[in-house]
A protein has these predicted regions:
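Hydrophobic faces of well-ordered beta-strands that scaffold small-molecule active sites
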Residues: 1, 17-21, 43-47, 84-86, ...
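A short acidic, helix-capping loop that chelates divalent metal ions and anchors anionic groups
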Residues: 51-57, 92-97, 182-187
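N-terminal pre-domain/capping segments
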Residues: 1-71, 150
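Active-site acidic/histidine proton-transfer and metal-coordination neighborhood
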Residues: 58-153
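Histidine-acidic metal/acid-base catalytic patches
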Residues: 8, 81-82, 134-137, 141, ...
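Alpha-helix-loop-beta-strand connector modules within alpha/beta enzyme cores
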Residues: 37-51, 104-118, 142-147, 195-204
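Active-site-proximal loop/turn and secondary-structure-junction residues that shape catalytic pockets
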Residues: 1-3, 23-25, 49-51, 88-92, ...
Length: 220
């Protein structure tokens, strides 16, 4: 995180009244909750992505990962955040992928129960094109719906899997907007590379510009 959370929010609040906070490093919640409470903004929260793995077959690690998400949900409730974005996890060992997927399904059930304890909506995000990633295609969306969880469409990730058109019919509640060449996860400015955003903009969903650099946000 390039800037302290307060400074980043002060700058961004001049552009929008809706901000998604990535809960990590110098923007971790609840550690820096006071900074977020200083602004009259609407929020969504992205739970930490490097502090756990809800698709981890080792039960202690899976449970610890859910505990981190629970802390994010508590902070989200304090802020009155509308959505908590959650990554579905990964598996680095091919021969363990099936067990990892089973662990993910257990976590989805746990998230269903956890969501009932809070007022924030839980949204699970589709991931990129690495073989280790779960939820690369829309066939996982019905599992989320059955559990009462929302779907966060990451447009850039969908493009990496040549699956954007397939995902558009899944009626996401939350959308991450960024561009790429379809090769790696660039998080480039909207319209600067390959993705046709005209179809995306027709979605009835909250859109979050998720570019890597502040200058790319301004270009978007």
């Amino acid at each position: 995180m390039k800037y302290p959370l307060f400074d980043a929010l002060e700058e961004i609040s001049c552009l929008t009244n809706f901000v998604e906070i990535m809960s990590a490093c110098g923007h971790s919640l609840p550690e820096f909750l006071e900074a977020a409470e200083s602004f009259p903004l609407r929020y969504s929260i992205h739970s930490p992505t490097s502090d756990g793995n809800i698709a981890e077959p080792t039960e202690k690690i899976r449970k610890a990962s859910l505990s981190v998400i629970c802390e994010s949900a508590e902070a989200a409730d304090i802020l009155g955040a509308e959505t908590l974005v959650i990554h579905p996890g990964f598996c680095l060992e091919k021969d363990m992928f099936e067990k990892s997927y089973e662990a993910l399904l257990l976590s989805i059930s746990d998230l269903e129960r956890m969501q009932d304890e809070f007022s924030v909506r839980f949204a699970v995000e589709n991931l990129g094109s690495w073989d280790c990633c779960h939820f690369r295609y829309p066939d996982f969306v019905p599992i989320l719906r059955e559990a009462g969880l929302a779907f966060c469409l990451d447009v850039g990730h969908a493009n990496l899997n040549s699956a954007l058109d397939l995902f558009l019919d899944s009626k996401p509640e939350h959308v991450h907007l960024h561009d790429n060449h379809g090769v790696w996860d660039e998080h480039a400015a909207l319209g600067s590379v390959d993705i046709d955003f005209s179809k995306v903009m027709k979605l009835d969903a909250v859109g979050i510009i998720e570019c890597m650099e502040y200058e790319a946000v301004l270009k978007s």
